[in-house]
């Protein structure tokens, strides 16, 4: 997601009000669905609810695809004859497409129209899902995952900016964002559960499951997503977009490849150097062009910077933990995919039941308090998992931390979204959405890559048992749990840092 700047942190909600570039006044305003002030959600029209539902399906699909494939990897490898190295790219291919193009997707949503970008990208996502489910070889399967990630990089910020431009800032928008992020959090959390259930039938259903949902979102979007004005009179900064996408793509690719190639190998070092050069060139260009893709002045706002940093730590810790948990339950305990799905069911249920209350809590306490509570719950959950052995008692050893993780993600993620986008002008809501989403996805990609390097077996652990014994194998996974706990605690520290009460930054 993406952002802009004058900061006014009001006492109850620590709101952000941003001063835009000097040419903002000449930009056309996006026409929202008619609303009566800050009317409560109960009085929203049928069209308003269907607009919200369409965007919620989109973001739930994005969340599902991030987490859903993990449980199916052993079955995919057995069916297609793939080794662990190839299996890793089924996961990382999606992350590469998603994490490297989110900012570009958010900006294009502003420039080309959110409705247009959403419908086109969602159509591509649907076709790629179908191709993945019908794939008979690894190349097509990995390619379809990459294309789905690229499509999701455009659907996610477009969907979120449709929320922020069609619901007025305040209780109305907080309510809509709470519902929206409930679907996002639930989609991500329920991805492992659905994958466990469907893998018992066939791994292909973990890919085909998205097709009917995507078609439903397309139909609703076509009829109920209003046409919005495009930003006119501003350059598209095509060179900047190319530099950013290329730099991010190479950076994520290098991080994902490093565990296999070696962190000190020539390809890895060269990849980091070239990626750094591309991103440095992007920053220099953005500081000089008249209409930049990103106005870096927004990072002078403490709340915006804090929201993006906590997004990195929250999502990174969660992705890392789910990866380790999948290996722990299947490789150490020998659980079936269905058994793992049932064990994780409380997480999804807690997310679904806690996230809807986030908007009320944000209105009362402000997003910062909710972020602190959320990251605190996640930290406690990860630390509790560190005491697990090879024969845990589910009700005593697994269920309590699972519930804490659901609470932490369910209230922490909506609060981060609100903090990062409040006060952003309509024509840059897509950018604001893209910046936070990019932070979250890049955090997840980096954490996953580091996790595979930290655990002794790495990706090779998928699909096989360590002959040295269950205890030794469990010890191999503990560094991944330490990483998750460390990231969550770092995010908690960032969220709790003292903040300035008022800061104004002039545009430019």
Predicted regions, residues:
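Interfacial helix-cap and linker-helix signal at transmembrane-aqueous boundaries
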Residues: 76-77, 108-109, 194-201, 255, ...
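12-transmembrane solute porter fold
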Residues: 48-57, 61-64, 69-71, 205, ...
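Helix-loop interface residues and adjacent transmembrane-helix termini in multi-pass membrane transporters
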Residues: 81, 111, 134-135, 170, ...
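Transmembrane-helix exit segments and adjacent C-terminal regions of multi-pass membrane proteins
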Residues: 4-51, 55-57, 418, 468-508
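Glycine/proline-centered helix-kink
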Residues: 157, 185-196, 248, 323, ...
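Transmembrane-helix bundle of Major Facilitator Superfamily
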Residues: 20-223, 371, 376-379, 383-386, ...
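C-terminal membrane-cytosol helix-exit motif in multi-pass small-molecule transporters
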Residues: 211-230, 245-257, 274-289, 491-499
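Flexible interhelical linker loops that connect adjacent transmembrane helices
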Residues: 42, 218-245, 287-302, 363-364, ...
């Amino acid at each position: 997601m993406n952002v802009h700047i004058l900061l006014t942190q009001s006492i109850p909600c620590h709101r952000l009000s941003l001063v835009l570039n000097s040419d903002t006044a000449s930009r056309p305003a996006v026409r929202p669905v008619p609303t009566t002030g800050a009317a409560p959600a109960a009085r929203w029209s049928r069209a308003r609810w269907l607009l919200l539902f369409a965007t919620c399906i989109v973001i739930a699909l994005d969340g599902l695809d991030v987490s859903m494939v993990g449980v199916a990897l052993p079955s995919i490898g057995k069916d297609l004859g793939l080794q662990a190295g190839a299996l890793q790219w089924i996961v990382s291919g999606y992350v590469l497409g998603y994490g490297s193009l989110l900012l570009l997707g958010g900006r294009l949503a502003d420039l080309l129209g959110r409705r247009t970008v959403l419908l086109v990208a969602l159509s591509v996502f649907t076709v790629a899902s179908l191709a993945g489910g019908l794939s008979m070889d690894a190349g097509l399967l990995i390619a379809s995952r990459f294309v789905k990630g690229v499509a999701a990089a455009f659907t996610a910020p477009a969907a979120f900016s449709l929320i922020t431009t069609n619901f007025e800032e305040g209780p109305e928008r907080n309510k809509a964002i709470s519902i929206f992020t409930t679907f996002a959090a639930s989609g991500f959390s329920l991805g492992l559960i659905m994958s466990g259930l469907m893998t018992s039938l066939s791994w292909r259903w973990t890919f085909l499951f998205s097709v009917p949902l995507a078609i439903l979102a397309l139909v609703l979007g076509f009829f109920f997503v209003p046409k919005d004005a495009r930003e006119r009179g501003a350059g598209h900064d095509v060179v900047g977009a190319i530099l950013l996408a290329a730099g991010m793509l190479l950076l994520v690719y290098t991080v994902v490849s490093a565990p296999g190639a070696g962190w000190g190998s020539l390809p890895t070092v060269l990849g980091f150097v070239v990626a750094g050069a591309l991103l440095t060139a992007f920053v220099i260009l953005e500081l000089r062009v008249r209409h930049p893709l990103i106005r870096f002045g927004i990072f002078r706002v403490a709340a915006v910077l804090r929201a993006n940093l906590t997004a990195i730590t929250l999502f990174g810790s969660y992705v890392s933990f789910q990866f380790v948990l999948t290996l722990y339950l299947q490789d150490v305990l020998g659980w079936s995919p269905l058994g793992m799905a049932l064990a994780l069911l409380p997480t999804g249920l807690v997310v679904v039941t806690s996230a809807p209350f986030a908007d009320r809590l944000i209105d009362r306490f402000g997003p910062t308090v909710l972020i602190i509570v959320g990251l605190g719950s996640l930290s406690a959950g990860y630390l509790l998992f560190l005491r697990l052995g090879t024969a845990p008692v589910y009700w005593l050893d697994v269920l309590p931390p699972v519930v804490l993780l659901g609470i932490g993600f369910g209230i922490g993620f909506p609060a981060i979204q609100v903090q990062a986008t409040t006060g952003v002008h309509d024509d840059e809501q897509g950018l604001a959405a893209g910046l936070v989403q990019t932070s979250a996805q890049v955090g997840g990609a980096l954490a996953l890559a580091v996790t595979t390097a930290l655990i002794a077996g790495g990706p090779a652990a998928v699909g096989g048992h360590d002959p040295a014994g269950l205890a030794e194998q469990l010890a191999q996974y503990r560094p991944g749990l330490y990483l998750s706990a460390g990231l969550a605690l770092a995010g908690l520290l960032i969220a709790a840092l003292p903040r300035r009460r008022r800061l104004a930054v002039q545009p430019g």
